[in-house]
Amino acid sequence: MPQSSRYSDEHVEQLLSELVSVLEKHRTPTDLSLMVLGNMVTNLINTSIAPAQRKVLARSFAEALQASVREDKAH
């Protein structure tokens, strides 16, 4: 069952589009894009989340990421 969000699809899509535009503007290869985005997630967790909740949130984020990755052969 999809999770509901307090953020509109339009807002999420706008932010995603802007982030992708920055990466494309710099012709960022996939591995560097993943490194930068991973560092951004780590920074957000370490600076915005209470220490006692960081590991739980990181685990939840990792599980959500794994659940959203498709296994089809398209790329």
Swiss-Prot record:
SUPFAM superfamilies for this protein: YejL-like
Family statement drawn from the similarity comment of this UniProt entry: Belongs to the UPF0352 family.
Disulfide bonds: none
Source taxon at top rank: Bacteria
Protein name per its UniProtKB record: UPF0352 protein YPO1261/y2923/YP_0880
InterPro entries named in the record: UPF0352 (IPR009857), YejL_sf (IPR023202)
